[in-house]
Structures are given as C-alpha cells and as structure tokens.
C-alpha cells in the first residue's frame, strides 16, 4: 500500500484544470477558456502523486532529471537490498509530476515502491513533519536497514532533508546523514548520482538541473521551447490551437483582441528564442528559481493582459471591443513582458531587463527620429516581425495631427521592446555583451577547458589589483592608518592562478553545471590558495573596475566576501617588508618606498 502525503503548495508541476473557466457569457467559444488551464490559481493547479490526466500527458515533456530518476528506479526495483531513493529539489520543480508520470507509465514497477511526498504537515495533527519522516523511514534507520528489503521513493525538499538529518532523529539515521554529506546533496556542488548497487541509498537532485543547458558557449532551452510549442503548435492534439482556429477567426473581435494577437505572436520562433534568453538572464542575473509551475503560469500572463481585461466579466467581449488605443498598446506582449513587475517574481526580474533602459548613440538617434516622424507605423513593418494585423488598430491615427503624445510614447516603447523580442534588420543593438561573455566563460569553466579561460582569470586578477584604485603592474593599493589624502599606499604582490579546482566534463552539451565560477589564486610567497565565487554581478563589476570604475559604499557592502578575499591576498604581499607611496593630485606625483633592511634591522624611506 502506498504511503502518500500531500502539500497544497509543494509538489506542483503541470498546472491544469479539467473544466473550462466559468463564464456563461462566453459560452463555449473563446480561447480564454482553454488558456485558463495554464493559470496557477486554477481549481486543480495542485498535483500530488495521483491521477495522470490526458491533459497532463499532453503537456508532459521529458527532462534529463526524469531520465536519471528512471534509471535509478529501474535498477533499485531489481536490487536485493533495501533501497531509498531521495528525489530532492525545491518547491514546484516537478518532483511529484515525474513520479506521477512513472506511476502511469510503469505501474508494475512502481507497485514495488512505497511513495512519500515530503510535506510540512504530518500524517496526524499531533505529529510534526520530522516525526512523520522518522516513522515512514523506520526501515532505513541504522538499526533496521541491514534487515530490510523495502523499496521507498521519497520526494523531499532540500531544506526539509537538512532539518531531518540535523533533528533529534539524526542519531537513528546516521547512515543516511553520512550519505547526504558525502554526496554533498545539500551543497551547490555537482556530484555523480549514478546507481550504487552496494548502497541502500540513491539520489537525484533536481536542483542540479536547470531550465537551460550550455553548449558551445551559449545557453539553450529545448524544455522552455517545448512548453511554448505545446501551447502554440498547430496540431490536432493541441486544445489551445484548436480553440484559436475554431473561435478566434470568426470572433467579432478578431481584429482588435490583444489575447488573439499575443497568442499569434507567441507562435513566432524569434519570440520563443527571446523568451528563452530572457529566462536565462533572469536566472543568472537575479538568481531566481523558476519552477515549471511558475513557467506555465507565466505563459498565461504573457498572453492574457489581465491588468486591463477582466476575463471573469460578463462583458468581456464588449470590454475588448471598447479598448482604447493606449490600453490596447499596453495589452500587447512586448509591453506585458517588461512593464508588469507586480504580476510575479518572474515579471519583476524581467522589468530589470527592460530594453528601454539600454541607451547608446544609435538608440538615442532613433528615438529622436521616431518622435519627429509623422508616420511611425512603417518602422514596425520594416524592423519588427509582428504577425499580420498585430498593430492594425493604430492604422487610422494621424500622427501628424494628433496632440495626444501618450500614444506616440506607448508605441515607441512597443517598438523598442518589440525590436528586442522579434526584431529584424540592424537599426541598433540592445544586446548585453557582458552577459554573453559571462555565459561563454561559464561554459568553458564548467567543462574545465583551460585554454579558453585565460582572459577570465586575467580579467579577474586585474579587477582584484584595481579594486582599491589604479596601481602599477603587480601592485595593489592598501589602506593603513588614517584615510590618506596626499598619498596612495601600495604593496607588491605576485598573484598566480590555481586551476586545480576546475571541473572536468567532456560533454559538448552541459546538462548539470554550476551557474557561478569558483576561481582560485595564490601568492608566490605562499603555497596556499584562496578562492572566490564569481557570479554575474561580480563578473560585471570587475570589468567595470578594469575600465576605471571605483566601487562605492553600496558595492563594498554587497560584495563583502570579495573584499575579505582581497584582504587575505593582500596579507601575502610585501607590506611587511616594503610599502610604496605615490603622491596624489600634483603636476608631478613623486614616488617613495618604505622598506625594512633585514640585515641591519632598520627602516629606510627613500624617493624612487
């Protein structure tokens, strides 16, 4: 008999409802009804380990984590010893969806296993979640595991696993604790999780797998694109496309409906690639974790502009017909993507990537040209790959006569954002070149390709040496005593790169990888190395420092660990033997050195 617990907000992957949105006014003829299946707050958005519906089967997409878990389950089912498979991860990452999928696909094999969904609530009100885990895992305790032949799959969040092995029950499960620590399950390290036939413990950590992969120095996501394709694909199985084809063409609002327009735009391959790129940027730059549940809900928010349209209104279609030009422009997908941080944490991250914040000479020149033009729609036709009729609603506006500057401004925003997601031609660049170089370095670092990493290590070293201000080659400025107004104080330091910690991975496409790079340096004076974790924010800041930027107080508060790292390296420099002083703000800045003569035991201060 299966031992299953459920948690309302925990084990969710594919978000569905089995009945259409309740709106009698719509009848059975609106795309919104089917799109509502994607909404996170829908009636049946919660998924445990139970029924795997036809719609879930349609939306299911195979992932690498699924393939790894499948291998473990197949081998564990044939083992002669007890087997506990830890399916670890975070909220909404699809643990229960995949287990539910296996139950449906391999019922005979899954019958051999007891299944348990970790939950913050216990089986009984009087018991805590720790009490429950202690009870259900009894056969895997130190005293029972050798005599057990039980097969058990535990879907558990990393935080709960950590709390359990550190709880009062940890002593009973010291072997499980040892396994978790040796495999570094609770750390950010990427460890091998292949089946160990001599062990009763196996694991797959969903947190090791990202929504994207790295290949040839670029990020890709067949997973995100597959989810979009499930929504937009022109196949008979696709209920969304079937509804669009059946209802949208004949709808009275077909030429003025932003929902139809956004659905059509989402079918554009350029748009899909841009969405993938934006998601990768959100994950790397903002360090957010995007679950499949949140991803699918995002697709709903992307198509349905609920900030301007109430889909539950009995006047929905009339309201759409009455949308004025300003709100219609705001309802279009490029504006939705970047302009609604209130919708979710994903939209909040996207708001920080708004291409309206990109300023360069070509962008500024275009804005002037756009604002002075009496006919702006040709710009869209020439440079933005919108579907036919996407901005048809604006064709009758006489921009030479209208005094309403707001509509021109909204269309300017629509153009720049639209050019970002599906532009054509080469009118200006909105690319983040620093991010592109970070992804390239991240790929080569995770592969351990030393020949491609010299610039990364050199740039980081230069950033370290210039963090406290411009200095001579192989010198670093230090702060001693009072704040020096007249002199800059420096020391000699010889930093050497240490690549002993580089990962080793010969795969061309990386499916398991770290999203930060751990770089090591050592001084020639000491054999000991110090390491620093370089994420995108630090990577970008160091490049700015190399170009002359001086970190401010906010930067120093944000990168405390990096400052501690610099201080450790500084202690290995020449400060105990020689200091260099350079005058500031003079026509000719003189240089001096203070050094200690070991032979005669005295200090000497001389001009260089």
Language-model features: where?
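A short, basic N-terminal segment
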Residues: 1-82, 433-439, 443-444, 448, ...
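Loop/turn-to-beta-strand initiation segments
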Residues: 147-154, 200-202
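Extended alpha-helical coiled-coil/bundle linker/stalk regions that scaffold oligomerization
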Residues: 224-490
């Amino acid at each position: 008999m299966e031992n299953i617990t459920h948690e309302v907000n925990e084990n969710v992957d594919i978000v569905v409802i089995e009945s259409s949105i309740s709106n009698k006014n719509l009848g059975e003829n609106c795309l919104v009804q089917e799109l509502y299946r994607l909404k996170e707050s829908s009636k049946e958005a919660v998924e445990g380990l139970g029924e795997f519906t036809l719609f879930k089967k349609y939306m299911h997409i195979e992932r690498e984590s699924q393939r790894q878990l499948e291998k473990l389950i197949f081998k564990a089912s044939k083992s002669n010893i007890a087997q506990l498979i830890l399916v670890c991860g975070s909220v909404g990452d699809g643990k229960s969806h995949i287990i539910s999928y296996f139950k449906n696909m391999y019922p005979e094999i899954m019958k051999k296993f007891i299944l348990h969904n970790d939950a913050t609530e216990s089986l009984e009100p009087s018991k805590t979640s720790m009490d429950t885990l202690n009870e259900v895992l009894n056969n895997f305790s130190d005293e029972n595991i050798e005599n057990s032949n039980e097969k058990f799959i535990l879907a558990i969040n990393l935080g709960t696993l950590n709390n359990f092995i550190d709880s009062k029950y940890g002593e009973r499960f010291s072997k499980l604790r040892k396994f978790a620590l040796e495999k570094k399950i609770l750390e950010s390290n990427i460890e091998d999780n292949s089946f160990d036939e001599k062990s009763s413990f196996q694991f797959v950590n969903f947190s090791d797998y990202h929504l994207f992969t790295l290949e040839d120095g670029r990020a890709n996501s067949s997973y995100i694109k597959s989810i979009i394709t499930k929504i937009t694909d022109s196949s008979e199985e696709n209920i969304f496309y079937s509804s669009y084809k059946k209802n949208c063409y004949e709808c009275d609002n077909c030429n003025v409906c932003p929902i139809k327009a956004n659905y059509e735009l989402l079918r554009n391959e350029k748009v899909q690639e841009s969405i993938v790129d934006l998601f990768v940027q959100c994950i790397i730059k903002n360090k957010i974790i995007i679950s499949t549940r949140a991803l699918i809900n995002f697709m709903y928010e992307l198509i349905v502009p609920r900030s301007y349209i109430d889909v539950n209104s009995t006047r929905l279609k009339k309201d759409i017909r009455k949308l004025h030009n300003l709100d219609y422009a705001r309802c279009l997908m490029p504006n939705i993507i970047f302009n609604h941080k209130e919708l979710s944490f994903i939209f909040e991250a996207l708001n920080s990537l708004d291409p309206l914040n990109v300023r360069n000479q070509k962008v500024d020149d275009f804005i002037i040209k756009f604002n002075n033009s009496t006919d702006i729609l040709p710009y869209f036709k020439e440079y933005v790959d919108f579907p036919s009729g996407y901005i048809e609603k604006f064709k009758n506006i006489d921009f030479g006569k209208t005094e309403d500057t707001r509509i021109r401004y909204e269309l300017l925003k629509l153009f720049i954002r639209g050019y970002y997601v599906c532009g054509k031609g080469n009118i200006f660049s909105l690319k983040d070149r620093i991010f592109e170089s970070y992804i390239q370095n991240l790929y080569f670092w995770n592969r351990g390709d030393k020949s491609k990493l010299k610039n990364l290590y050199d740039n980081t070293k230069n950033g370290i040496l210039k963090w406290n201000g411009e200095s001579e080659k192989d010198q670093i400025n230090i702060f001693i005593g009072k704040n020096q107004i007249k002199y800059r104080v420096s020391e000699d330091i010889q930093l050497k790169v240490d690549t002993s910690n580089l990962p080793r991975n010969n795969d061309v496409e990386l499916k398991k990888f770290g999203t930060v790079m751990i770089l090591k340096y050592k001084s020639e004076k000491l054999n000991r190395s110090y390491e620093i974790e370089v994420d995108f924010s630090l990577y970008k800041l160091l490049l700015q420092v190399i170009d002359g930027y001086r970190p401010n107080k906010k930067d120093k508060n944000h990168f405390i660990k990096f400052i501690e790292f610099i201080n450790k390296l500084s202690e290995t420099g020449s400060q105990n033997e020689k200091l260099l002083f350079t005058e500031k703000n003079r026509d000719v800045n003189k240089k001096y050195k203070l050094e200690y003569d070991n032979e005669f035991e005295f200090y000497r201060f001389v001009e260089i």
